[in-house]
Amino acid sequence: RQRQMCIRDSNVKGRISYITSHARQENLYATYRTADSTFWSNLARESQQEFQRSGTEGKCIEARELIIALPEIYTQYEPQQVLTDFTEEFRRRYGVECVSALHHNKRKTNYHIHLIFSERRLLPEPDVKVASRSVFFDETGKRVRTKKEITGEDGQIRKGCTVIKKGEVYESHLFTTKDTRFKGCLLYTSDA
């Protein structure tokens, strides 16, 4: 049995902190990470930038979280080993970075893993776009062709519009696009 949650609103780092904090989780037995906090900070920032650029309605999904119930027999095994093995298998199978935590609920009736994972992979080299000529963006962040399109009646660039001068970086990506396998579906990992 498992549930899937989307981590939204610049909260992947907050959610990681919450599930891995002994101060906030009284029945926390083990935690495990395949990527450091810099990875998750960069992922959150780039996801938010992509979301704003897309102009999509709703909320930005920075990462996904699975909550996987384990049979109580797993309480007999060493918690760190259970969590490490499970997380590394998920990482190997899907090729994604993860943070995980092994918990019991307050009544100790539900032994479970929280597994947060990235839908994007780190690129081998950052993809940096440098303006070969001046680039103009309107108030919504949409690229326009000419300076005239973002200039007000007073001859000044309108508030909220942006000009990127020739030779400046106007876009950079550290991550791939989202893996579509994870969109709107549950992942069943019990067939291992």
Task: Go through each PLM region and give its residues.
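N-terminal nicking endonuclease/strand-transfer module with a His-rich metal-binding environment
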Residues: R1-Q4, R8-D191
